[in-house]
Amino acid sequence: MANQKTYTYPIFTVRWLAIHALAVPTVFFLGSITAMQFIER
């Protein structure tokens, strides 16, 4: 529970993969919706 940049546990990698696995499709989904809105108008 210390504020040190330790790479002993792979939690950082799993957390990074989880964040990107959720963020990338979300950004793509929002971008496609925005494109549909601009194309429709």
Curated annotation (Swiss-Prot):
Keywords: Chloroplast, Electron transport, Heme, Iron, Membrane, Metal-binding, Photosynthesis, Photosystem II, Plastid, Thylakoid, Transmembrane, Transmembrane helix, Transport. GO terms for biological process: photosynthetic electron transport chain. The keyword Glycoprotein does not apply. One of its GO terms (molecular function) is iron ion binding. One of its GO terms (cellular component) is chloroplast thylakoid membrane. It is found in: Plastid, Chloroplast thylakoid membrane. The keyword Transcription does not apply. Heme binds at H20. It is a single-pass membrane protein. It comes from the Eukaryota. InterPro entries: PSII_cyt_b559_bsu, PSII_cyt_b559_CS, PSII_cyt_b559_N. With its partner (PsbE) binds heme. PSII binds additional chlorophylls, carotenoids and specific lipids. Its cofactor is heme b. The chain crosses the membrane at residues 16-32. Belongs to the PsbE/PsbF family. Heterodimer of an alpha subunit and a beta subunit. PSII is composed of 1 copy each of membrane proteins PsbA, PsbB, PsbC, PsbD, PsbE, PsbF, PsbH, PsbI, PsbJ, PsbK, PsbL, PsbM, PsbT, PsbX, PsbY, PsbZ, Psb30/Ycf12, at least 3 peripheral proteins of the oxygen-evolving complex and a large number of cofactors. It forms dimeric complexes. This b-type cytochrome is tightly associated with the reaction center of photosystem II (PSII). PSII is a light-driven water:plastoquinone oxidoreductase that uses light energy to abstract electrons from H(2)O, generating O(2) and a proton gradient subsequently used for ATP formation. It consists of a core antenna complex that captures photons, and an electron transfer chain that converts photonic excitation into a charge separation. This is Cytochrome b559 subunit beta.
